[in-house]
Design a protein with these regions (language model features):
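Conserved S-adenosyl-L-methionine
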Residues: 308-429, 436-437, 449, 457-459
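Nucleic-acid nuclease catalytic cores
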Residues: 82-133
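Nuclease catalytic cores
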Residues: 1-19
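Conserved catalytic cores of phosphodiester-cleaving nucleases, focusing on short active-site segments
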Residues: 57-59, 66-80, 98
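Short amphipathic alpha-helical segments and their helix-coil junctions
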Residues: 79, 165-184, 273-279
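Active-site metal-binding core of divalent-cation-utilizing nuclease and nuclease-like domains
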Residues: 25-65
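A conserved structural/catalytic subdomain of Rossmann-like adenosyl-cofactor enzymes
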Residues: 62, 77-78, 86, 136-149, ...
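Long recognition/docking surfaces used for binding and targeting
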Residues: 194, 198-302
Length: 619
């Protein structure tokens, strides 16, 4: 006769072997928890449809928001059902049900265990990310240690997406407090956040900031901690320290931050919010540019047109895409000549670090292989802080124009970049000229055979005006066009810039007889959400990215998506010009979308159409 108690005893034995019972930061409970939050969540989670849910085991990993919930069945034939909806009869089904209820407040590992002996034991694991709608099946057939489970959760795309969603939500809340309570100026908003994050990376400040009695003494403590942090960095040039400190000291001009009122806790509360709501998400393995996210949030409340200022920050999934397109290796040296808040460099660093476990190589990557140039002093400060917080041991950033001849020579000879990524400032004249100047300069910085990738307005590669054709000719005289990807029209939502990614091999003149690859990458799977911006709601991005990357790398021609074409500077560099329409795929919805995209494009670049004139149009 089957006996479920045997299965439970085997589970206890596994817990004991993994140290669960001996770990003071782990609580193993059976059927009922003393935790009032868990009690409340399981109040109506019965497998029979009503009443209290009572899992065989509830494991709390203290100091985290992670739970394990385990359901046992004696017979392996009762391990799991095909539809996972027979909660009372099957181990996995029941564990998933409990996980659904508990995931309102926790990340939950739902574990189904069946069998009455070690030889017949079956174990399945499913992960519920907090506030998610469905679980993820983990291809793991054992109960893992606490650290293994935490690492598994941390490494999932779903957990990263959850973290990003929370960073964005917390960013909005912190910005609201800065705007309404501290009344800080627009230009200093991102500065104060980067200052707080940099100061919190100093243990002495993180442990003592709440002892400051006034806003002024707290600001002084923060600035002193930042200076100590910067001066402790090996080979950090004094000039860079001065530039950064000059920008951080600009916070002294804010009345609320220079107050001697002992009962004014607003500044302290901001630091507390950053520490509790942002800092926990920060680690050197995460490619999300959180300082860039703050910057974008602040821009949304800034007077004036963001595109008019030339400010268009690159979405996180696109900076990661660049790394895959370039197939970055641990020995590559990456440069971004217009690095902004450092988004491309962060993604490149994480891509390289993920490819080696050697501490010496990882240290070399952080210290020597990431180079950035940024002309705007405050933006330079944000980028430098961003990299330092992530363990960049040297911060090879230059506060200068990438066109500065002295800087150009120094960077090229000292760092010898092999890969370049760039999202240059976008021209306010819609003529596409200035962006192509940046592209040429970027390619000239590279070592022979290096790869240069840039995301630029699509009119730079499609315009047939003499000015733009001449600039493209200058590029092709020295460098080979490998490929162009036409990007989604809403990629930079709410800014209406329509873009393309260009990919070049440096210092190999373009052969117009050899075909380049063109991809119609208008659909990345993201949708526009009123409150969250563009999001991968339907989880399509990974599949789309694989298609884009593999098609480019393998130079594949896919009907309706990609094509190989030999081009010169006088041709249009975009898939739309050469792909044959697949009429079988056209329906009313797609036709309407195409018309809408055309009107967006024409509205954005109407001045270019007018400049071409009737005579050119007829030609």
């Amino acid at each position: 006769m089957s006996n479920e108690r045997k299965t439970e005893q085997l589970t206890r034995k596994i817990f004991k072997s993994l140290g669960y019972y001996d770990d003071k930061n782990v609580i193993v409970e059976e059927q009922i928890s003393d935790n009032p939050i868990i009690q409340k969540l399981l109040k109506s989670a019965s497998k029979k449809g009503s009443g209290m849910g009572k899992p065989e085991f509830i494991v709390q990993l203290l100091s985290t928001d992670v739970l394990l919930v385990i359901e046992c069945k004696a017979k392996t034939s009762n391990h799991k059902s095909a539809a996972l909806d027979k909660f009372a009869e099957y181990a996995v089904d029941g564990a998933i049900l409990y996980g659904k209820y508990l995931s309102k407040e926790f990340h939950v590992i739902s574990v189904g265990v069946s069998g009455e002996s070690e030889e017949t034991l079956r174990i399945s694991n499913y992960l519920w990310i907090k506030e998610s709608f469905s679980p993820i099946e983990l291809k793991i057939e054992k109960i893992c240690s606490k650290q293994e489970y935490l690492s598994i959760i941390k490494g999932t795309n779903e957990k990263k997406e959850y973290d990003i969603k929370n960073i964005k939500k917390n960013t909005k809340a912190i910005h609201k407090t800065l705007r309404e309570t501290i009344k800080i100026t627009d230009e200093l908003k991102p500065i104060i956040i980067s200052a707080i994050l940099l100061a919190l990376s100093e243990k002495s400040f993180a442990d003592s900031y709440n002892t400051a009695t006034t806003p002024k003494s707290l600001l002084n403590l923060m600035l002193t901690s930042i200076r100590n942090k910067l001066e402790s960095i090996e080979s950090m040039p004094e000039e860079k320290v001065k530039i950064m400190m000059r920008n951080f000291q600009g916070l002294e001009s804010i009345n609320k931050l220079s107050s001697n009122k002992k009962d004014d806790k607003d500044f302290l509360n901001i630091i507390e919010k950053v520490k509790t709501e942002i800092w926990p998400f920060i680690n050197t393995e995460h490619s999300f540019d959180y300082i860039g996210e703050f910057y974008k949030e602040f821009l949304s409340y800034t007077d004036g047109n963001k595109k008019g200022l030339g400010i268009v920050l690159t979405p996180n999934h696109i900076t990661d895409l660049f790394c895959e397109l370039a197939n970055i290796g641990v020995n590559d040296r990456i440069i971004d000549p217009c690095c902004g808040t450092g988004g491309f460099l962060i993604s490149a660093m994480n891509s390289m670090l993920s490819k080696t476990d050697d501490p010496q190589i990882q240290r070399r990557i952080r210290r020597d292989q990431l180079i950035g140039i940024e002309s705007e002093s405050k933006m330079f400060t944000l980028a430098a802080a961003n990299m330092i917080i992530r363990g960049d041991g040297k911060s090879n950033l230059y506060n200068a124009s990438c066109f500065d001849k002295e800087i150009f020579t120094k960077v090229k000879s000292t760092h010898k970049p092999t890969i370049a990524f760039m999202n240059p400032p976008y021209s306010q004249t819609d003529d596409g000229g200035s962006e192509l100047d940046f592209v040429l300069n970027m390619l000239n910085l590279l070592e022979p055979g290096g790869l240069g990738l840039a995301i630029i307005p699509i009119n730079c590669v499609c315009s047939l005006l003499d000015k733009e054709v001449e600039k493209r000719e200058k590029i092709l005289e020295k460098h080979t066009l490998l490929g162009v990807m036409s990007m989604p029209t809403t990629l930079f939502y709410p800014v209406g810039t329509v873009t393309a990614i260009v990919i070049f091999e440096a210092h190999r003149p373009h052969n117009s007889q050899i075909k380049s690859w063109f991809g119609y990458c208008r659909d990345d799977g993201f949708v526009v959400s009123r409150n969250s911006g563009r999001i991968d709601r339907n989880k399509k991005w990974e599949e789309k990215k694989a298609l884009w990357v593999n098609s480019f790398r393998n130079r594949e021609e896919i009907k309706g998506f990609s094509i190989l074409k030999a081009v010169t500077a006088k041709d249009e560099w975009c898939a739309e010009a050469y792909l044959q329409p697949d009429y079988s795929q056209i329906n009313e919805k797609k036709f309407q979308r195409a018309v809408e995209e055309y009107f967006v494009y024409k509205a954005l670049y109407s001045s270019r159409f007018e400049e071409i004139g009737e005579e050119d149009a007829e030609a």
